[in-house]
UniProtKB/Swiss-Prot annotation:
Start-end of Acidic residues biased regions: 229-244
CDD domains attached to this UniProt entry: RPS2 (cd01425)
UniProt keyword Ribonucleoprotein present: yes
UniProt protein name: Small ribosomal subunit protein uS2
Region (Disordered) residue spans: 224-244
GO MF term (any one): structural constituent of ribosome
Name of the gene encoding the protein in the UniProt record: rpsB
Record's GO cellular component terms: cytosolic small ribosomal subunit
Pfam families reported in the protein's UniProt record: Ribosomal_S2 (PF00318)
Biological processes per GO annotation: translation
Keywords per UniProt: Ribonucleoprotein, Ribosomal protein
InterPro entries documented for this protein: Ribosomal_uS2, Ribosomal_uS2_bac/mit/plastid, Ribosomal_uS2_CS, Ribosomal_uS2_flav_dom_sf
Domain of life: Bacteria
Family (UniProt): Belongs to the universal ribosomal protein uS2 family.
Organism: Desulfitobacterium hafniense (strain Y51)
Length: 244
């Protein structure tokens, strides 16, 4: 069965690119035509590229790999959080803090501080502190949760990035490239596809389009994880047979 259909892509408006004056010539190979001053993305290519991205991410997850979902623009925030949580992966959907990967140890210290504050609240420490101090601590905790909540359980650098709009997330893309972390991305007609390892040519401004494609990436991860679990169970069963 196909990973995604042309009908689904059309219904979600995946084919609508940017205005012709706002384009990157490197995206020409993914453009089908121009209509009313807007580029139309070649959905046959999108179908193939979604399949390529799906297989790549599924295999990565089957090998125990992790993916960091990145999408901080309004149209992507909700989908990125929901789909990353659904497949048990990490996400950044508010603001990419410079050095999130290239200065990972420092970011981990901020995550530790977030955990410390959460523990204080859970253990009732806030209840015995002065109101003014509690208000300041809560404010700090909420701010840390907002920016780092999606990577709270990420103990090491991810094995891949999934990015919605690499142009908007250029700092994340630059950090991943510097660290040789592969990038899968939803790439619109105004982006540079050369910076992305697995390009999904698509509209990155429509909520439905972003939701559809982000959901497929999450599906691939879940499928990979299930395959990994089944392989583990088969291995354990084989070991038991040998032991008998």
């Amino acid at each position: 069965m196909a990973v995604i259909s042309m009908k689904q892509l059309l219904e979600a408006g995946v084919h609508f690119g940017h205005q012709t004056r706002r384009w990157n010539p490197k995206m020409a190979r993914y453009i089908f035509t121009e209509r009313n001053g807007i580029y139309i993305i070649d959905l046959q290519k999108t179908v193939r590229k979604v399949e390529e991205a799906y297989n790549y991410v599924r295999n990565l997850a089957a090998d125990g790999g992790t993916v960091l979902f990145v999408g901080t623009k309004k149209q992507a925030q909700e989908s990125v959080k929901e789909e990353a949580e659904r497949c048990g992966m990490y996400y950044v959907n508010e603001r990419w803090l410079g050095g999130m990967m290239t200065n990972f140890q420092t970011i981990q210290k901020r995550v530790s501080r977030l955990r410390e504050l959460e523990k204080m609240e859970a253990e009732g420490v806030f209840e015995v502190l002065p109101k003014k101090e509690v208000a300041a601590l809560r404010h700090e905790m909420e701010k840390l949760e907002r920016f780092l909540g999606g990577i709270k359980s990420m103990k090491k650098l991810p094995d891949a990035l999934f990015v919605v709009d690499p142009r908007k997330e250029r700092i994340a893309v630059a950090e991943a490239r510097r660290l040789n972390i592969p990038i899968v991305g939803i790439v619109d007609t105004n982006c540079d596809p050369d910076e992305i390892d697995v390009v999904i040519p698509a509209n990155d401004d429509a909520i439905r389009a972003v939701k559809l494609l982000t959901g497929r990436i999450a599906d691939a991860i879940i499928e990979g994880q299930q395959g990994s679990d089944e392989a583990e169970e088969a291995e354990e069963a084989a070991e038991e047979v040998v032991a008998e």
